[in-house]
Amino acid sequence: MLILTRRVGETLMIGDDVTVTVLGVKGNQVRIGVNAPKDVSVHREEIYERIKKEQQAGPEHDSD
């Protein structure tokens, strides 16, 4: 894992197309902004895990 230190207003680059900017720090929370192309999905980890779990379950079938 790469560990970086950034201050509010500073940005890091991921590849050529994704930027992550520190917008603010308040207590133990950090607000970040992510700019990415539309074809790159950006999710919080808990949302991403839920999406993966739903995709693995597959479509539910009605037994009528």
From Swiss-Prot:
One of the GO biological process terms: positive regulation of translational initiation
The keyword GTP-binding is assigned to this record: no
Purpose: A key translational regulator that binds mRNA to regulate translation initiation and/or mRNA stability. Mediates global changes in gene expression, shifting from rapid growth to stress survival by linking envelope stress, the stringent response and the catabolite repression systems. Usually binds in the 5'-UTR; binding at or near the Shine-Dalgarno sequence prevents ribosome-binding, repressing translation, binding elsewhere in the 5'-UTR can activate translation and/or stabilize the mRNA. Its function is antagonized by small RNA(s).
Pfam assignment, any one: CsrA
Descriptive protein name: Translational regulator CsrA
Signal peptide: none
Source organism of this protein record: Methylococcus capsulatus (strain ATCC 33009 / NCIMB 11132 / Bath)
NCBIfam families: csrA, PRK01712.1
Quaternary data: Homodimer; the beta-strands of each monomer intercalate to form a hydrophobic core, while the alpha-helices form wings that extend away from the core.
Keyword terms of this UniProt record: Activator, Cytoplasm, Repressor, RNA-binding, Translation regulation
PANTHER family linked: CARBON STORAGE REGULATOR
Cell compartment(s), UniProt: Cytoplasm
InterPro entries according to UniProt: CsrA, CsrA_sf
GO CC, alphabetical: cytosol
GO molecular function per UniProt: mRNA 5'-UTR binding
Similarity annotation: Belongs to the CsrA/RsmA family.
Keyword Hydrolase: no
